[in-house]
Amino acid sequence: MYQRFWYKFYDAKVSSYYFQFYAISARRKKTIVSAICLLATSAFLLQMSQNTTNHLVWIVLVISSQLVALFQPLFPYEKQYHAACYIYEDVNQLCSEMEAYWRTIGAETSDEEINQKIILFSDKQDKIENRFATADLFPQSQRMHAKAVKNADYYFRGLN
């Protein structure tokens, strides 16, 4: 039972890192699109002020870049960012609870008690992930998962 609990704890920590990296990636995408819209609008306005012809073309380009900035909250990475932040915070709290319980497990702890905790923590993790995210909101990213596994390994090396 100790081994099963340890694997569940490890899985929760990997999940925590995974959603942390997803939030970072989504925030990066958000920043990049905002910067592109800002630079495009500035460049178009500068060009429009210097060019006396084709004002309509420059006005359309400025408006289109502003529309992209306006509809940016509707892009999927905006939802990913907010959902990943909430999931990360809650799963990280769950990992803290699991770590506190791991430190209390001793030889006198029964397998039944450990099994109940495994079920309890699994249910909590499922509820956290299902509450904030739909299945299609977070497409699998092998790169982020590998990075999360690597960071979890570093974390658990320091825990022992």
Regions found by a protein language model. Name each.
Residues 40-54:
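Juxtamembrane "helix exit" motif at the C-terminal ends of alpha-helical transmembrane segments
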Residues 40-44, 61-68, 72-75:
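Membrane-embedded alpha-helical transmembrane segments of multi-pass integral membrane proteins
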Residues 52-64:
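Hydrophobic alpha-helical transmembrane segments
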Residues 1-39, 71-160:
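Conserved non-transmembrane functional hotspots
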